[in-house]
């Protein structure tokens, strides 16, 4: 549960009220998970012990944002959580794409697209550049896959990257992370 308050004093009062109400229902606040967090941004410039929290897989903390006029400022924004980023990184590693040299790119795309689409649909809603940075790891594994699959690319990862970039230009929708913006040619789309 997240409760917003205008001041620290009001937050302490609200926490006490919530604790009383939960006690009436035979429940109690988890002291380990219950924090008062200062939502630092361009208008709130103070400091507090806790300036970030994780909720539903997102980490909310002060982040740089761009105004509609092109200027940058600090805002309190959600992005994929640190624990979720690590978990997804482990899943990507566990796929061992680079070792599947008997498979085609289409086979690899069919194997991973459903899961990647789920990640992009959920975690890509806010601060998508954090997720794009994570999804570019898939491209690194695909480059290694190309080096294993094709003898002419074996010791030339730059050529393998160009090979994948050519595939992207021919079939930009082959992989879900390419459609999301994690392109194999080193550019990103819509992740600014």
What is each PLM-predicted segment?
Residues 1-192:
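Non-catalytic terminal/accessory segments
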């Amino acid at each position: 549960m997240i409760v917003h308050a205008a001041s620290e004093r009001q937050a302490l009062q609200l926490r006490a009220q919530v604790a009383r109400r939960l006690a009436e229902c035979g429940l109690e606040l988890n002291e380990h998970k219950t924090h008062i967090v200062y939502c630092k941004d361009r208008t709130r410039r103070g400091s507090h012990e806790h300036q970030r929290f994780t909720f539903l897989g997102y980490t909310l903390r002060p982040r740089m944002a761009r105004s509609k006029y092109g200027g940058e400022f600090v805002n309190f924004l959600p992005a994929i959580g640190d624990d979720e980023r690590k978990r997804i990184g482990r899943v990507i590693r566990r796929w061992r794409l680079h070792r599947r040299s008997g498979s085609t790119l289409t086979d690899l795309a069919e194997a991973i697209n459903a899961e990647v689409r789920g990640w992009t649909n959920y975690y890509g809603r806010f601060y998508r550049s954090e997720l794009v940075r994570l999804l570019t790891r898939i491209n690194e594994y695909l480059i290694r896959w190309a080096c294993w699959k094709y003898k002419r690319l074996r010791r030339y990862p730059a050529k393998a990257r160009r090979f994948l970039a050519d595939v992207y230009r021919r079939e930009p929708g082959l992989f879900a992370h390419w459609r999301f913006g994690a392109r194999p040619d080193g550019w990103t789309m819509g992740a600014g």
